[in-house]
């Protein structure tokens, strides 16, 4: 039994390209599609386009997590997720483990002939959006033997958005998540690590559904499709490449320019999301504290009750490598507590659209 991607009984979450409803494209980490069904087997047909690293999709089937390797060929491929299941109700959440190192098109699910698709529970009414970098994507998170250490050599196999502090926090708070994050990215173009050697920054990518020019035509995002209650700005670490001007001179022209651009970006998002609460932060990945001091300065300058600066207990000094699962759990615990301390009123859903 073929289940088309535009079947109304499928449930989606994330910044996903639905221009072709029969072939939606998952771009961002933590984007997912969920299907509830009765039956004994399920497969999925996907078309993968890869820029770098090996591509892997993740899934949660009846509470148990798994993954599978995607082919590097651009054509459609059918992947068996499970066979010989008990003939009862099942829930599958198929999610994007990685950022735009690849994009994947969903072409449908295949169930047994005697299967039945069920209507899933509604998504949470609470909504979070994270604008961040590789840490927010869960990059190299599964390399748990390297907690507090530099990264091991890898080909993307340790990256898993499920274990990002961002998705952990959303689950803690029973909220939807748009993880609008990209590994290696900085705020400004020509800085950071994403799309070397020219380097694309958040300013060029934040308003796109497709922003990886090696994989597809660049395409704008319609912000009316998702209105978050809480917005987390979690960047300012890759910005020290190729030059850590903030560490060298806090008052330099480059440093002041960064603060001005950060403020303009924040104020633009505040206009797009006029009722949202904003949390400005970085992570425990090692970086010079002047980046966080700059963010604090912007927060004070904006001087809005909707804007908060948050520092983790190990902010900027926790690890020289990416954040592993135990470290992400601690970050999530601290961030969850901070968001909860802001009160229930930040989740007043009457102020927001109902679109997922």
Feature-to-residue mapping (PLM):
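Conserved SGNH/GDSL esterase-like catalytic core that processes O-acyl groups on lipids
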Residues: 28-30, 151-251, 285-292, 322, ...
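Short, well-structured beta-strand segments within conserved domains
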Residues: 42, 76-104
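Serine-esterase "nucleophile elbow" of acetyl-processing enzymes
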Residues: 56, 90, 113-192
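Conserved small/polar residues in nucleotide/adenosyl-binding loops
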Residues: 352-356
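Active-site segments of SGNH/GDSL-like serine hydrolases
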Residues: 232-239, 262-297
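Glycan-recognition and processing domains
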Residues: 1-27
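Short, surface-exposed beta-strand/strand-loop-strand elements in extracellular ectodomains
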Residues: 54-64
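Extracellular serine-dependent O-acyl
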Residues: 277-348
């Amino acid at each position: 039994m073929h289940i088309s991607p535009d079947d109304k009984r499928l449930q989606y979450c994330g910044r996903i390209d639905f221009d072709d409803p029969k072939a939606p494209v998952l771009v961002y980490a933590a984007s997912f599609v969920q299907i509830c069904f009765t039956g004994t087997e399920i497969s999925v047909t996907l078309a993968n386009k890869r820029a770098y690293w090996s591509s892997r999709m993740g899934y949660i089937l009846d509470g148990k997590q798994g993954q599978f390797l995607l082919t590097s060929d651009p054509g459609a491929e059918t992947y068996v997720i499970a066979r010989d299941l008990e003939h009862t109700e099942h829930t599958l959440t198929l999610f994007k483990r990685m950022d735009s190192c690849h994009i994947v098109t969903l072409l449908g699910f295949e169930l047994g002939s005697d299967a039945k698709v069920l209507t899933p529970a509604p998504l949470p009414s609470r909504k979070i959006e994270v604008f961040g970098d590789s840490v927010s994507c869960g990059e190299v998170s599964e390399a748990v033997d390297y907690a507090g250490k530099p990264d091991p050599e890898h080909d993307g196999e340790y990256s898993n958005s499920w274990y990002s502090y961002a998705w952990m926090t959303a689950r803690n708070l029973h909220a939807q998540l748009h993880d609008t994050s990209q590994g290696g990215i900085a705020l400004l173009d020509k800085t950071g690590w994403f799309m070397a050697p020219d380097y694309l920054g958040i300013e060029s990518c934040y308003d796109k559904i497709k922003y990886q020019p090696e994989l597809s035509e660049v395409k704008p995002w319609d912000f009316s499709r998702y209105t978050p209650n809480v917005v987390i700005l979690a960047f300012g670490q890759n910005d020290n490449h190729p030059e850590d001007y903030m560490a060298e001179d806090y008052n330099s022209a480059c440093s002041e320019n960064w603060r001005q651009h950060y403020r303009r970006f924040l104020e633009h998002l505040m206009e797009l999301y006029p009722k949202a609460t904003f949390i400005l932060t970085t992570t425990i990945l090692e970086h010079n504290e002047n980046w966080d001091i700059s963010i604090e300065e912007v927060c004070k300058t904006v001087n809005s009750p909707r804007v908060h600066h948050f520092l983790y207990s190990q902010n900027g000094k926790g690890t020289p490598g990416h954040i592993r699962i135990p470290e992400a759990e601690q970050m999530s615990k601290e961030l969850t507590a901070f968001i909860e301390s802001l009160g229930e009123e930040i989740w007043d859903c009457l102020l927001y659209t109902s679109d997922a």
